[in-house]
C-alpha cells in the first residue's frame, strides 16, 4: 500500500497523519486511543486500499506536536474538526478506538462536521462514564443496569466483571502513566510492554513489529497528565446520534467494561455487538471482523 506520512499546520500545532492518497471518493477517518497513535491502525488500513484513508495523530501523540496543552477533550475535537475542514473530507466513515471514541462522539454533535460523517464504528469506546470513581462506586451507581445485563448462563463471567470493576480504577491508570515517566528509554519500554500485555493484549499479542511500533507510540506521548484529567472528567451527554453507528466491544476488555460499551450504544442509538474472546484491542483480537464491518459501512 502507498501510505504517505504527511503534516498539516492547524490550531498552532503540526498534526501528523497517514494518507494513502487514494482517488476513491469513499473516505475513512481513523481516530486512535490513548497511549497510541495512527500507527495502531496500520494493519487494518493495509486491507482497505480501495478507499481513501486519513489517520491523524492527535495533539501530543505520535509524531504530532504538543505546543499547547490540552485542557479538555474538546481540544482534541477542535483539532480533528479543523483537520476535516482543511482537507475537506466529506461523506466519510468515522472509525474510533477507546479515547478516540469520545472525540468521535463530540464530532458527531458539531454543526459543521456532523453532516460530513456518513456513519460511525466505535471500537471499545470511552464515553459512557468517566474514571472519576473507583470500581466499587461505579458498580454501586449502576447496579441495576449491570444486574439486568448479567450472563446467567456463564456466571463466572459476572465474577470477572465485578472483580474488574472493583480493581481497575483511576489509580491504576495513573500508576501506569507514572511508570512511563521513569528515566531511561528501555526501562520505560519494558514497563509499557508489561502494561500492554496485561491490559491491552491480554488475549492475543500482535506481531512483534506491530507490537514494538505501538510501544514506540506510547513513548512519544507527551500529554499524560492532561489526558488523565480527561479520563476522570469526561462523560458523553449528547443523546442519540444522527448517523448510523455500531459499537464493537470485547467481553474480556480490561480497560473499559463491555457493559459500558452497551450502555453507550443504547444512549446514542447504535447497534451493539459483544465480542467473545476479545479484549480492549478489538483491531488485534477481531481484525477480520473489524475490516468486514468497515467495508460494509463504507459501501452503504
Describe the role of every protein-language-model region.
Residues 42, 55-99, 106, 112-114, ...:
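Active-site loop/oxyanion-hole signature of alpha/beta-hydrolase fold enzymes
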Residues 1-28, 49-51, 85, 89-90, ...:
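Alpha/beta-hydrolase fold catalytic core
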Residues 241, 247-249, 253:
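Short beta-strand/loop motif that positions the catalytic acidic residue
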Residues 156-240:
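Conserved alpha/beta-hydrolase catalytic His-Asp/Glu region
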Residues 255, 278-291:
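Catalytic histidine-centered segment of alpha/beta-hydrolase-like enzymes
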Residues 20-65:
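Conserved HGGG/HGGXW glycine-rich cap/lid loop of the alpha/beta-hydrolase fold
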Residues 120-181:
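Flexible "cap/lid" loop of the alpha/beta hydrolase fold
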Residues 254-260:
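Conserved alpha/beta-hydrolase "acid-adjacent" motif
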Amino acid at each position: 500500500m502507498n501510505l504517505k506520512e504527511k503534516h498539516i499546520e492547524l490550531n498552532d500545532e503540526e498534526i501528523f497523519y497517514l494518507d494513502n492518497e487514494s482517488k476513491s471518493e469513499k473516505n475513512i477517518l481513523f481516530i486512535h486511543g490513548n497511549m497510541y497513535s495512527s500507527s495502531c491502525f496500520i494493519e487494518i488500513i493495509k486491507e482497505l486500499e480501495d478507499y481513501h484513508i486519513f489517520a491523524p495523530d492527535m495533539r501530543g501523540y505520535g509524531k504530532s506536536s504538543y505546543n499547547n496543552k490540552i485542557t479538555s477533550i474538546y481540544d482534541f475535537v477542535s483539532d480533528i474538526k479543523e483537520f476535516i475542514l482543511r482537507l475537506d473530507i466529506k461523506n466519510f466513515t468515522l472509525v474510533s478506538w477507546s479515547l478516540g471514541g469520545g472525540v468521535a462522539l463530540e464530532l458527531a454533535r458539531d454543526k459543521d462536521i456532523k453532516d460530513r460523517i456518513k456513519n460511525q464504528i466505535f471500537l471499545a469506546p470511552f464515553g459512557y462514564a468517566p474514571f472519576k470513581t473507583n470500581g466499587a462506586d461505579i458498580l454501586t451507581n449502576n447496579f441495576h443496569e449491570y444486574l439486568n445485563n448479567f450472563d446467567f448462563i456463564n456466571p463466572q463471567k459476572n465474577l470477572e466483571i465485578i472483580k474488574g470493576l472493583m480493581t481497575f480504577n483511576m489509580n491504576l491508570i495513573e500508576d501506569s502513566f507514572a511508570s512511563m515517566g521513569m528515566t531511561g528509554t528501555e526501562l520505560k519500554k519494558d514497563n509499557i510492554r508489561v502494561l500492554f500485555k496485561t491490559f491491552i493484549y491480554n488475549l492475543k499479542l500482535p506481531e512483534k513489529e506491530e507490537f514494538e511500533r505501538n510501544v514506540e507510540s506510547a513513548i512519544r506521548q507527551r500529554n499524560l497528565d492532561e489526558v488523565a484529567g480527561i479520563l476522570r472528567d469526561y462523560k458523553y451527554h449528547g443523546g442519540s446520534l444522527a448517523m448510523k453507528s455500531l459499537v464493537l466491544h470485547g467481553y474480556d476488555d480490561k480497560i473499559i467494561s463491555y457493559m459500558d460499551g452497551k450502555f453507550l450504544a443504547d444512549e446514542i442509538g447504535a447497534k451493539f455487538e459483544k465480542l467473545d474472546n476479545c479484549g480492549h484491542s478489538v483491531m488485534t483480537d477481531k481484525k477480520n471482523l473489524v475490516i468486514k464491518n468497515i467495508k460494509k459501512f463504507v459501501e452503504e
